Regions:
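Non-catalytic accessory segments flanking enzyme active sites
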Residues: 24-67
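C-terminal catalytic domain of Rieske-type non-heme iron oxygenases
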Residues: 3, 76, 87, 147, ...
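Short Pro/Gly-enriched beta-strand edge/turn motifs at strand-loop
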Residues: 45-56, 125-129, 264-269
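Generic structural signal for secondary-structure transition and capping sites
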Residues: 43-47, 94, 211
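Short, contiguous pre-domain boundary segments
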Residues: 6, 10-26
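Rieske [2Fe-2S] iron-sulfur-binding domain
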Residues: 55-159, 163-173
Length: 374
């Protein structure tokens, strides 16, 4: 904590009692010093969910992801092993790949044409045979920890990190219970936004349904708020609620035991199992700075050829539901800097943990306090 002023120190028991809790102070959402601390103490040390395994199912498939200024490339080798590396050439630092797609059997740097095998080993460096003491072992790509877990791909920049299951104990089994088809999902749509909001602001918004009625009329028409619960499980939480058919959003057969499952994963991923069988949505957050977050909002179905009903649902997410949340977090980010905001807001957590209770935010802010404690 020596690099932070006392303004950024939180007591270890901050928000420990949700019914008496207030949010973290506003400057934690706006000050770059807080974000720099989070970069090293949250994002460089945590397992971050970055993709569904189906996006990297075949040999030579690759994707790139950027988080806290680091570009990471994930690639499936010809040996079918999925690996992650820092997306940087060890020669002079040029990035190797961009976007996603099919890699060739060697990755060639665009700058000086150094070539690397898909396992990260150097294949060839031009003129290296004429360079004294050239050591190919020191010219390999630098690996990033990677695990496939519950149908998804996670990375961790800490080489000494324990497993995803250690960070999120019990999550995998619960996701599989909520969506038995999770391993069969395929990406159907992606909405990418560079959102002018702090990553914690976006998580706060996700961790409560207090705003659902006023801000999400279509979604609220399908969720039964009186049969909606939010349970805490350490580094992940589960929002669970029974669903009802709605002409505004989710259409399914009346009388089925349909439900919503919303999983938040520390620090910044949200997995959503919808009432529609064989469907999930995922919000991947990739923080850029204290007031900017790159978000991928991905929609998955088990079938590749989409039905008209599925296409309509994608359009509803794109044109209605997603913009509703974006407007909320963008407005909050502006308001947090207002002279009229008192610096902290009362967390509306009720004693019953009802469907509109904000106790999930208190839980999240207590986890943040462990990062900012003295």
């Amino acid at each position: 904590m020596s690099n932070l002023s006392p303004d950024f120190v939180l007591p270890e028991n901050f928000c420990a009692n949700p019914q008496e809790a207030w949010t973290i102070p506003a400057h934690f959402y706006t000050d770059q010093n807080a974000f720099e601390h989070e970069k090293e103490n949250v994002f460089a040390k945590s397992w971050i969910c970055v993709a569904h395994s189906s996006e990297l199912a075949n040999a030579n498939d690759y994707v790139t992801r950027e988080i806290i200024g680091e570009s990471i490339v994930l690639v499936r080798g010809r040996d079918k092993v999925l690996r992650a590396f820092y997306n940087v050439c060890p020669h002079r630092g040029h990035q190797l790949l961009s976007g996603e797609g099919k890699a060739k059997n060697v990755i060639t740097c665009p700058y000086h044409a150094w070539a690397f095998k898909l396992d990260g080993n150097l294949a060839h460096a031009r003129n290296c045979e004429n360079v004294a003491n050239f050591d190919s072992d020191k010219a390999q790509l630098v690996p990033v920890r990677l695990e496939e877990y519950a149908g998804f791909v996670f990375i961790n920049m800490d080489p000494n990190a324990t497993s995803v299951e250690d960070q999120l104990p019990g999550l995998g089994a619960k996701v599989l219970e909520a969506c038995p088809e999770v391993h069969d999902l395929k990406l159907a749509a992606r909405f990418t936004t560079r959102t002018p909001a702090n990553w914690k602001n976006i998580v706060d918004n996700y961790l409560e349904c207090y705003h659902c009625g006023p801000a999400h009329p279509g979604f609220s028409d399908s969720v039964q708020v009186d049969r909606y619960w939010h349970t805490m499980h350490g580094n992940w939480t589960l929002q669970y609620g029974f669903a009802k058919p709605s002409e505004q959003s989710f259409k399914f057969e009346e009388g089925t035991d349909a439900a919503f499952h919303g999983f938040w994963l520390w620090p910044c991923t949200m997995l959503n199992v919808t009432p529609i069988k064989g469907m999930m949505t995922v919000i991947y957050e990739f923080p850029v700075d204290s007031e900017t977050t790159l978000q991928n909002y991905d929609i998955y179905f088990t079938n590749e050829e989409l039905t008209d009903e599925q296409k309509s649902l994608i359009e509803w997410y794109r044109d209605v539901f997603r913009p509703e949340d974006l407007r909320l977090v963008e407005s909050v980010q502006k308001g947090l800097k207002s002279r009229g905001y008192r610096g902290q807001g009362r967390i509306m957590a009720d004693s019953s943990g009802s469907g509109i209770s904000e106790h999930g935010i208190a839980h999240f802010h207590n986890l943040l306090a462990q990062v900012f404690k003295d």
